[in-house]
């Protein structure tokens, strides 16, 4: 770890015109991978953070808002999720949350960047909490697009697919995984009652990109849910889009969600049945013109 010899400020862009200033106290690792710049640092307000190409991906003090909201609505919507695929999520927290469900027999995490996974394993233990070593988990270092195409050819199927990728507007790495055509491929590797969920960036600052993702999901799934959660270290509300082939997340009552979590042995810090109800009934923020 390198102590910062003076005040260093991360300038995190929220849009082309607005930025968030974050004080950094110490830097643990800086590495330029073949795909992106990776920084792991300690911040004043958000604790340890993973930064990819100037964007905070996760922070110790608020990552549960993000990861629990990404994972559990989809997992709770499915009555018996056994096989789970995660695209992205290199710090291991999405894998951690999925593995909390006692129904899960197999969880495959596919990330294109080996360096993110290895640095997260070394410097972000609070994120993964040993999930990489769970016997039900398999970590694959591969382009998610290629993995899905190979899964189609192999006839591999999943109950829940969780897309924890970089934003559709922040870099070129994941853009092809947000298209209508890719969601058609996702549908082909889901079981007949499967569920997919993706983070979709921010609808306020990037409405066109958000709409692209939303239309891609709507074109391929009969049941669609939009929801969002404020993430302090991001400086904005993160949007999520859930697509389902059979089960409607809007139909779940708080007591049904809580009972599914209890039966599966899931312990959460943020997500509950009442939170699920709130997520499914909140407005999506856009600029009011």
Curated annotation (Swiss-Prot):
Family, as annotated: Belongs to the spermidine/spermine synthase family.
Record text on subunit structure and interactions: Homodimer or homotetramer.
GO molecular function: spermidine synthase activity; thermospermine synthase activity
InterPro entries linked: PABS, PABS_CS, SAM-dependent_MTases_sf, Spermi_synthase, Spermidine_synt_N, Spermidine_synt_N_sf
Gene Ontology biological process terms, A to Z: spermidine biosynthetic process
Protein name: Polyamine aminopropyltransferase
Chief location of this protein within or outside the cell: cytoplasm
Pathway(s): Amine and polyamine biosynthesis; spermidine biosynthesis; spermidine from putrescine: step 1/1
Cited function: Catalyzes the irreversible transfer of a propylamine group from the amino donor S-adenosylmethioninamine (decarboxy-AdoMet) to putrescine (1,4-diaminobutane) to yield spermidine.
Active site location: 164 (proton acceptor)
Binding of spermidine, residues: 67, 91
Keywords: Cytoplasm, Polyamine biosynthesis, Spermidine biosynthesis, Transferase
Organism listed in the record: Pyrobaculum calidifontis (strain DSM 21063 / JCM 11548 / VA1)
Pfam families with a match to the protein in the record: Spermine_synt_N, Spermine_synth
């Amino acid at each position: 770890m390198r102590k910062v010899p003076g005040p260093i400020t991360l300038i995190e862009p929220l849009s082309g015109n607005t930025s968030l200033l974050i004080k950094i106290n110490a830097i643990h690792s800086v590495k330029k991978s073949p795909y992106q710049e990776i920084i792991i640092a300690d911040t004043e307000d958000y604790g340890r953070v993973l930064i990819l190409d100037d964007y905070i991906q996760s922070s110790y003090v608020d990552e549960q808002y993000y990861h629990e909201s990404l994972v559990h609505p989809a997992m709770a919507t499915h009555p018996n999720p056994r096989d789970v695929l995660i695209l992205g999520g290199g710090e291991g927290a999405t894998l951690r949350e999925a593995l909390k469900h006692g129904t899960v027999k197999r969880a495959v995490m596919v990330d294109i960047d080996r360096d993110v996974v290895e640095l997260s394993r070394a410097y972000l233990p609070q994120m993964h909490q040993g999930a990489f070593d769970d016997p039900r988990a398999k970590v694959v270092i591969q382009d998610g697009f290629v993995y899905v195409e190979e899964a189609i050819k192999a006839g591999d199927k999943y109950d829940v697919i969780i897309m924890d990728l970089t934003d559709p507007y922040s870099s070129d790495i994941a853009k092809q995984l947000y298209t209508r055509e890719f969601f058609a491929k996702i549908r082909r590797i889901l079981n007949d009652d499967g569920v997919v969920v993706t983070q979709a960036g921010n609808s306020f600052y990037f409405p066109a990109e958000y709409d692209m993702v939303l239309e891609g999901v709507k074109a391929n799934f009969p049941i669609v849910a939009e929801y969002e959660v404020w993430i302090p270290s991001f400086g904005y509300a993160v949007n999520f889009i859930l697509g389902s082939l059979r089960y409607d997340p809007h139909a779940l009552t708080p007591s049904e969600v809580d009972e599914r979590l209890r039966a599966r042995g899931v312990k959460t810090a943020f997500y509950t049945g009442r939170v699920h109800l709130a997520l499914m009934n909140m407005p999506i923020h856009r600029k009011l013109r």
